[in-house]
């Protein structure tokens, strides 16, 4: 979608980049006469995926067009943070054409970046992410009781600042598809699940920005059609 310019990717710096095919090999099939019980299994990489532009998704993943922080932006989580990960490489690109259905695609991306840079909620998420990284890197624990308690109180006080992240309200409203709404009369559990999901979506600033980007692209697409009609009439 990104290579064809049919989508704007919004999110962290990159996806985890798991661009491989793996097979699970039971070790019991290899070791004969095993008296030690289940030996478990290992995963072997047998194939790799490539994008139409020739690049692998392994290690580098898909880089976002609009980078926004999340709580774990600075935490080492992916395979790229481990020892000896399978490297990124590139092959000959496929023969493809970029979709030209949007006008001012880059302008929509630029507008989103400007909104994100000014958003106080995003700044707070970034601050929270850096604080979590500090907590992860902290490897000294005082054996003095008073010093330890003081440090814990300080951390708790600082964490209070980030509780407001859970209270964010985009004021977006969501509704289930018609067929699900019909099921609600018979399935109250499904209704409760959807209600919780919709509330979570309303608190999600990334969903809110995705809607804003879609609005920009929609407006720009309308402009394109108006320009085409004007040129035909002219």
Question: What are these language model-derived features?
Answer:
Residues 51-230:
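Conserved functional hotspot residues or short segments at active or partner-binding sites
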Residues 232-234:
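Terminal low-complexity/disordered tails
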């Amino acid at each position: 979608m990104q290579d064809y310019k049919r989508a704007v990717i919004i999110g962290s710096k990159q996806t985890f980049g798991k661009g491989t095919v793996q097979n699970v090999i039971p070790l019991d099939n290899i070791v004969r006469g095993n008296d030690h019980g289940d030996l478990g299994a290992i995963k072997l990489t047998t194939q790799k995926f490539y994008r139409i532009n020739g690049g692998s998704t392994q290690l580098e993943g898909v880089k976002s067009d609009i980078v926004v922080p999340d709580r774990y932006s600075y935490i080492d989580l992916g395979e790229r943070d481990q020892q000896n990960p399978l490297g990124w490489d590139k092959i000959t690109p496929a023969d493809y054409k970029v979709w030209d259905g949007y006008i001012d695609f880059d302008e929509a991306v630029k507008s989103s970046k400007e909104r994100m840079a000014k958003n106080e909620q995003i700044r707070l998420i970034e601050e929270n992410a850096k604080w979590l990284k500090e907590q992860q890197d902290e490897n000294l624990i005082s054996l003095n009781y008073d010093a330890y308690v003081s440090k814990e109180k300080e951390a708790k006080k600082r964490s209070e600042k980030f509780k407001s992240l859970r209270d964010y309200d985009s004021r977006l409203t969501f509704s289930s598809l018609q067929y699900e709404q019909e099921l609600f009369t018979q399935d109250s559990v499904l209704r409760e699940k959807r209600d919780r999901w919709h509330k979570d979506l309303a608190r999600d600033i990334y969903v809110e920005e995705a809607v804003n980007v879609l609005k920009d692209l929609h407006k720009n697409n309308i402009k394109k059609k108006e320009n085409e009609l004007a040129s035909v009439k002219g």
